[in-house]
Amino acid sequence: MIVVDASAALAALLNDGQARQLIAAERLHVPHLVDSEIASGLRRLAQRDRLGAADGRRALQTWRRLAVTRYPVVGLFERIWEIRANLSAYDASYVALAEALNCALVTADLRLSDTGQAQCPITVVPR
């Protein structure tokens, strides 16, 4: 069981490699906000001509088909607020969920592991 953030999910959806292997091998848990973050990340890549429209659509369809357990963020507010000094509310949502579930957080965002705020293991995968 792992919590996966949008950066790692995007890496898995768009590239072969460590992120895809981890996501294929584990039960995935995410805060609800991940779906919007994934759609936003794909949109940004498409606007920069780094991703075609058909590839973006396929990535969204693949994400939708994955067995992912989603959690409301409202139950994580207290911990999100506690770590607000060094993490955005978005990033803190992933950390708080991983802590609550007592599992690792998988991310492609190196700075997330450098804050010293997380009380859970963090695995950084290549983008």
Curated annotation (Swiss-Prot):
<keyword id="KW-1277">Toxin-antitoxin system</keyword>
<keyword id="KW-0479">Metal-binding</keyword>
<comment type="function">
    <text>Toxic component of a type II toxin-antitoxin (TA) system. An RNase.</text>
</comment>
<dbReference type="Pfam" id="PF01850">
    <property type="entry name" value="PIN"/>
</dbReference>
<feature type="binding site">
    <location>
        <position position="91"/>
    </location>
    <ligand>
        <name>Mg(2+)</name>
    </ligand>
</feature>
<dbReference type="GO" id="GO:0004540">
    <property type="term" value="F:RNA nuclease activity"/>
</dbReference>
<comment type="similarity">
    <text>Belongs to the PINc/VapC protein family.</text>
</comment>
<protein>
    <recommendedName>
        <fullName>VapC ribonuclease Mb0985</fullName>
        <ecNumber>3.1.-.-</ecNumber>
    </recommendedName>
</protein>
<dbReference type="GO" id="GO:0000287">
    <property type="term" value="F:magnesium ion binding"/>
</dbReference>
<dbReference type="InterPro" id="IPR022907">
    <property type="entry name" value="VapC_family"/>
</dbReference>
<keyword id="KW-0540">Nuclease</keyword>
<dbReference type="InterPro" id="IPR029060">
    <property type="entry name" value="PIN-like_dom_sf"/>
</dbReference>
<dbReference type="InterPro" id="IPR051619">
    <property type="entry name" value="TypeII_TA_RNase_PINc/VapC"/>
</dbReference>
<keyword id="KW-0460">Magnesium</keyword>
<feature type="domain" description="PINc">
    <location>
        <begin position="2"/>
        <end position="115"/>
    </location>
</feature>
<feature type="binding site">
    <location>
        <position position="5"/>
    </location>
    <ligand>
        <name>Mg(2+)</name>
    </ligand>
</feature>
<dbReference type="InterPro" id="IPR044153">
    <property type="entry name" value="PIN_Pae0151-like"/>
</dbReference>
<dbReference type="InterPro" id="IPR002716">
    <property type="entry name" value="PIN_dom"/>
</dbReference>
<keyword id="KW-0378">Hydrolase</keyword>
